[in-house]
Amino acid sequence: MGFLIGGSCFVPSVPLHSRFLSSPSSSSSSSPSSSQFGLLCSSNVAKFKRRRPTLASLNQEDGYEYDVASAKRRAFLLVGISVLPFLQLRSPALADERGNEIKTSKVDLETEVAVVSEGTSPNPFLALLNGLGIFSAGVLGALYALARQDTKAAEETIESLKNQLKDRERALVLKEKDFEAKLQHEQEERKKEVEKAKEEQLSLINQLNSAKDLVTELGRELSSEKKLCEKLKDQIESLENSLSKAGEDKEALETKLREKLDLVEGLQDRINLLSLELKDSEEKAQRFNASLAKKEAELKELNSIYTQTSRDLAEAKLEIKQQKEELIRTQSELDSKNSAIEELNTRITTLVAEKESYIQKLDSISKDYSALKLTSETQAAADAELISRKEQEIQQLNENLDRALDDVNKSKDKVADLTEKYEDSKRMLDIELTTVKNLRHELEGTKKTLQASRDRVSDLETMLDESRALCSKLESELAIVHEEWKEAKERYERNLDAEKQKNEISASELALEKDLRRRVKDELEGVTHELKESSVKNQSLQKELVEIYKKVETSNKELEEEKKTVLSLNKEVKGMEKQILMEREARKSLETDLEEAVKSLDEMNKNTSILSRELEKVNTHASNLEDEKEVLQRSLGEAKNASKEAKENVEDAHILVMSLGKEREVLEKKVKKLEEDLGSAKGEILRMRSQPDSVKAVNSTDNKEKSDNTVTVKKVVRRRKSSTSS
């Protein structure tokens, strides 16, 4: 053995392959129970403890080799110790000590081989039990390891999913914090921009004050600048028109933004509805999985019921075969009985012929009456014995027929039970088919809902694309408006610079126009009011633009969130599609199983139809047997009647023989009388001869007596003919 390499271990008496291949008959024996296996192992261990002689094990060679092969030796030792309880130990040797010489180990091995050769032959049944135990232990270990691996894999997947969920939650928290920080940063930047705008407004106010001072100083130059003021008025009117257009554009943009916001809200509602529908579909899928598990359990139960019914059918077939054999036997017995009855009939016919011959030969039988009487008595006794035997055989046949009928009734009961079981299984299969149809309808409904959800998702994607396009258009329009506002601002600053230059140029000319200063002041005050109003309008426009930017950013964020939700929905839809594919595959397997079950049911139907046909044949055969029984009974009755008639005929013949005997005695008496008369007649003739005179008288008397004798003989012959005719 391989585990003799390292350390002290047990040396088995017979190799393991010889134990498993010792007897072919042991392989065909049935597997024992686990308790018997444990008892046998314990008995083998006890025998091993009784018989073990000590042997020296193989010597440890070198320290280096031991260090190299230590792991292998430990493994072999563990394998040997685990296999020892399952081995048959008739004459084992225990190596307890480690020698220092290789020669002693070789000698011990040779002695062990000799002991093994002298030992008793192993029990093949126990060897087979050991092999089966080892095989079952290996199979159970492998199955347990596979189950543990599956459970570990499932637990690892669950833990990985939990870790992924935790990582996603952390990422979401970090994104929220980053988003809040970005919002705060943007708010601070907007505050800074507002402060800058306020500073610019203050600078503009200071510039306007300086311009007022310059106007007060340059009142003379207003006359020349009227034209310029008119031009400025025209420009202001154009700016106001542009501002009014910008306001109208702003209102249109606000209406568009409101419409987009309404669309976004509708999309959010649709997304919520889709999420609810997806949750419902997930719940339905879970329900489908649960129902599928139930159906699988029910299919297993049906398979077990089907196996039981197949076993019952096989037993019923065996019983039917036995009943057929018994019926064949009964048929053979009935054929033998029929042949015996035919022989009896032939004998009866022969007896009738003999009777007729006896009746025809009554004249000859009258001479051999004593011999005929003896033969008739012996034949009557033999006929009585034959009739009694035949009656006993008929009673046995009746008993066999009753037993066969009882067996047929039992088989009918069994077939009725089998038909009931078959109907129950058929009902269960009908119920399962209805459930499968319902599941198919539910699957079609889920498919329709999934298609509707896909259509809605596609519609949402189109709406999102449209909203994205509109947002891009709005951003472009806002950029255009912002650029126009910048251009208007630059034009306004340019005009202010030009006015400053013109005011400096016209400072020399304002001295002449001081008279018109007040009018110009009034006009300038109106212009300043208009400028203030325009600045206020510009500030309001800036605020509105800031709000528009905020709304655009919020809409962008909402669009990003919608994109994420759409991606998650797409992922969920893909997962649902995968689940549906898995469910379709499971459904296909279930449909195949159902088709197999239907095929098995069809086979069962065929078998039941065959059994019913066989039962009908058995019933017809039983009815035929009953008819034959009735025919036999009738034939037996007829035979009995014929035997009775034969007995009566024999009795009549006996009576006739007795009457003939009596008539014979009478005739003998008459003959004696006639002989006496003849003697007397002879004496008288002699006397008459002596007396010749009286001859005539004697002759006349003789003639009279002869006539009388002839008359009596004719009467006797007539009586015999009448008796024979009767």
UniProtKB/Swiss-Prot annotation:
Q: What is its main location?
A: plastid
Q: Where is this region: Disordered?
A: 678-726
Residue ranges, compositional bias (Polar residues): 691-701
For this entry, the transit peptide stretch runs 1-41, 42-95
- Stromal topological segments: 146-726
As recorded in UniProt, coiled-coil segments are 144-691
Q: Which UniProt keywords apply?
A: Chloroplast, Coiled coil, DNA-binding, Membrane, Nucleus, Plastid, Starch biosynthesis, Thylakoid, Transit peptide, Transmembrane, Transmembrane helix
Give residue spans, biased composition: Basic residues: 715-726
Q: What happens when the gene is disrupted?
A: Larger chloroplast starch granules than wild-type. However, in most chloroplasts only one large starch granule is present, in contrast to many in wild-type. No accumulation of ADP-glucose, the substrate for starch synthesis. No effect in amylopectin and amylose biosynthesis. Mislocalized PTST2 within chloroplasts. Loss of DNA-binding activity in leaf chloroplasts. Loss of both chloroplastic and nuclear localization in leaves.
What residue intervals hold the motif Nuclear localization signal?
715-722
Gene Ontology molecular function: DNA binding
Q: Can you say where in the cell this protein is located?
A: Plastid, Chloroplast; Plastid, Chloroplast thylakoid membrane; Plastid, Chloroplast stroma, Chloroplast nucleoid; Nucleus
The regions listed as transmembrane in this protein's record are: 125-145
An example Gene Ontology biological process = starch biosynthetic process
Q: Report the GO terms under cellular component.
A: chloroplast; chloroplast nucleoid; chloroplast thylakoid; chloroplast thylakoid membrane; cytosol; nuclear matrix; plastid nucleoid
What is the membrane topology here? Single-pass membrane protein
Topology check: give the Lumenal, thylakoid ranges: 96-124
Give a short account of its post-translational modification: Predicted to be translocated into the thylakoid by the Tat system. The position of the transit peptide cleavages have not been experimentally proven.
Q: Does the keyword Nucleus apply?
A: yes
Q: Domain note for this entry?
A: The C-terminal part is necessary for DNA-binding.
Query: Quaternary arrangement and interactors, per the entry?
Result: Interacts with PTST2; the interaction is essential for the initiation of starch granules biosynthesis in leaf chloroplasts, for the correct location of the process in the stromal spaces between the thylakoid membranes, and for the association of PTST2 with the thylakoid membranes.
- Main role? DNA-binding protein required for the initiation of starch granules biosynthesis in leaf chloroplasts. Anchored to the thylakoid membranes with its C-terminus facing into the stroma where it is essential for localizing PTST2 and SS4 to the stromal spaces between the thylakoid membranes in order to begin starch granule formation. Associated with leaf chloroplastic nucleoids in vivo. Binds to various chloroplastic double-stranded DNA fragments without particular sequence specificity in vitro.
According to UniProt, the name of this protein is MAR-binding filament-like protein 1
Q: Which organism is it from?
A: Arabidopsis thaliana (Mouse-ear cress)
